[in-house]
């Protein structure tokens, strides 16, 4: 969850040699990549947040949980548990204000998790897992890389098509940034975090630089 096993000295020694990152590491040494409590919830929130602000994505997540989650009673402010994969697989998710296509993407992910086709708890091969994710409608390389970074703790995950990364690194396209980022292996996730920190807008989600690809097709910049 808190990436406590990371070695900031080792990571900094590698990334600090790069002209794009050296000053950022000096200003903010020791950044760690935050994880999550639940891979499915993180993945749904990643889909909810595509192409919109943090504020808007948080609003949608709240609607989703209130409408489809399990209501509970606590002494504090927690009122609902996040919806189960089986529950979301059958839900009319577009009713919370999503486009039908985005709702179907979440339903497809939920169905795959409910059926055991996607299992965040037993990932052996990260590349194969990301490939299975990308077979689902509405999920492309950006989303798969972001999930690998935040839900699976992959230190080398890198969503090169992310708009904030492209802006912070002053690259015009995903291909050129991906080529430059090869020198950051095996710590590209940390490089992404430093670039996001430099993007400067606290209300801007990590997001793809172009519209989400249609299911089964790839584009030069995908979500």
Regions found by a protein language model. Give the residues of each.
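HhH-family (HhH-GPD) DNA N-glycosylase catalytic core used in base-excision repair
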Residues: 1-223
């Amino acid at each position: 969850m808190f990436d406590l096993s990371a070695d900031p000295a080792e990571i900094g020694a590698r990334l600090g040699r790069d002209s794009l990152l050296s000053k950022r590491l000096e200003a903010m040494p020791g950044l760690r990549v935050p994880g999550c409590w639940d891979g499915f919830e993180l993945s749904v929130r990643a889909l909810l947040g595509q192409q919109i602000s943090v504020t808007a994505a948080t609003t949608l997540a709240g609607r989703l949980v209130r409408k489809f989650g399990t209501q509970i009673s606590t002494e504090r402010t927690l009122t609902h548990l996040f919806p189960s994969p089986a529950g979301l697989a059958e839900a009319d998710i577009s009713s919370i204000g999503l486009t039908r296509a985005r709702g179907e993407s979440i339903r497809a992910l939920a169905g795959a998790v409910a059926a055991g086709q996607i299992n965040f708890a037993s990932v052996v091969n990260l590349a194969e897992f990301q490939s299975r994710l990308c077979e689902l409608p509405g999920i492309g390389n950006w989303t798969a890389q972001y999930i690998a970074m935040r839900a699976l703790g992959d230190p080398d995950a890198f969503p090169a098509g992310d708009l904030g990364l492209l802006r912070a690194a002053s690259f015009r396209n995903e291909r050129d940034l991906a080529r430059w980022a090869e020198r950051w292996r095996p710590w590209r996730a940390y490089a992404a975090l430093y670039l996001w920190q430099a993007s400067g807008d606290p209300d801007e989600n990590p997001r793809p630089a172009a519209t989400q690809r249609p299911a089964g097709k790839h584009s030069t910049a995908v979500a």
